[in-house]
Amino acid sequence: MFTSVAQANAAVIEQIRRARPHWLDVQPASSLISELNEGKTLLHAGPPMRWQEMTGPMKGACVGACLFEGWAKDEAQALAILEQGEVNFIPCHHVNAVGPMGGITSASMPMLVVENVTDGNRAYCNLNEGIGKVMRFGAYGEDVLTRHRWMRDVLMPVLSAALGRMERGIDLTAMMAQGITMGDEFHQRNIASSALLMRALAPQIARLDHDKQHIAEVMDFLSVTDQFFLNLAMAYCKAAMDAGAMIRAGSIVTAMTRNGNMFGIRVSGLGERWFTAPVNTPQGLFFTGFSQEQANPDMGDSAITETFGIGGAAMIAAPGVTRFVGAGGMEAARAVSEEMAEIYLERNMQLQIPSWDFQGACLGLDIRRVVETGITPLINTGIAHKEAGIGQIGAGTVRAPLACFEQALEALAESMGIG
């Protein structure tokens, strides 16, 4: 089909560029992902793993999900069914989904429905819980469970009804094109895009024939949840990268993800095969009372943003983030994006960055360039406490391990008969 890797890569990148993901709906995970109806099943972030291999925050999120679903009445009972192997685990990526941090998603949890209207493929992600103690970082107290019940019983139906009033939902490309000019890089900073989203949703929510108290609660939640758009950006990037993966050739990375134990990548020319290596631990700034020694190793599907070419690769779009993640100032942000541009093949002119002289965000992460230069993707990330139940303790950056890319390049060469 293709006469060279370069030709294949051009086709993959064009497929990604053509993708037009729209936010269409919010539905229970069980109605979108059939595997969640098969006994006690949870989705998790990262490449495949077992309960025994999980770190503290992911285990804490599993306990929380067991309590939320009513599989257990308390922490001890939840741990017992998890330890006894009664719960089946599936990577989010295996079912067209992504999840931040632990990525733990159960049947009753609401999920965003994002459809690439160009090709018809869909991607799913759970909803952002806001700040404080949250399940994605491993907390599972009654306050966390109460918030999840509210998201299921109030937030989901209101958002679904509001989106139902909008023809073809919300065009996320158009919204992100605005957001990136307003200082978002879509991983650690989403405040502008979340505000744009609120602007689009508010008139539709106000017109709903719903309980006024519920409408007020939803508006209050959206008004203070600066990272609400993150989960939409993740589903957007998943839908676009899955579109690229339809071209089963070339050396373009179509997924990067971490589970607190292993970092995994997928490559366009190698299908759904994972190439893994041990994760690194994020370095950054910590909330008062916490330190680097308490940081959990890297985890989460949110590196799908860097796979697409935003997040850490677009640090120059959000120089304010560099201080939050402990990476310096404006020149440091520029240096990061200039370095990342060396390992991506093209630019995404749909996402032009004013502070980068209106250059487009990076596009087309190439394993060949990573291995040749030794430059690995820089990922912006939240930092979880390594013990279950505590939650987020800071934010920082982390590098993908080079070994994943080396393994993938060797496998690609072998598949092409290059010895």
Curated annotation (Swiss-Prot):
Disruption phenotype: The deletion mutant cannot produce oxamate during anaerobic allantoin degradation. However, the levels of oxalate, produced via a glyoxylate shunt, significantly increase. Its EC number is 2.1.3.5. Optimum temperature is 30 degrees Celsius. Transmembrane segments: none annotated. Optimum pH is 9.0. No enzyme activity is detected at pH 6.0 and 7.0. Activity increases in the pH range of 8.0-9.0. Pathway: Nitrogen metabolism; (S)-allantoin degradation. InterPro entries: AllG-like, OXTCase_su_AllG_h-dom. It catalyses: oxamate + carbamoyl phosphate = N-carbamoyl-2-oxoglycine + phosphate. Component of a carbamoyltransferase involved in the anaerobic nitrogen utilization via the assimilation of allantoin. Catalyzes the conversion of oxalurate (N-carbamoyl-2-oxoglycine) to oxamate and carbamoyl phosphate. This is Oxamate carbamoyltransferase subunit AllG.
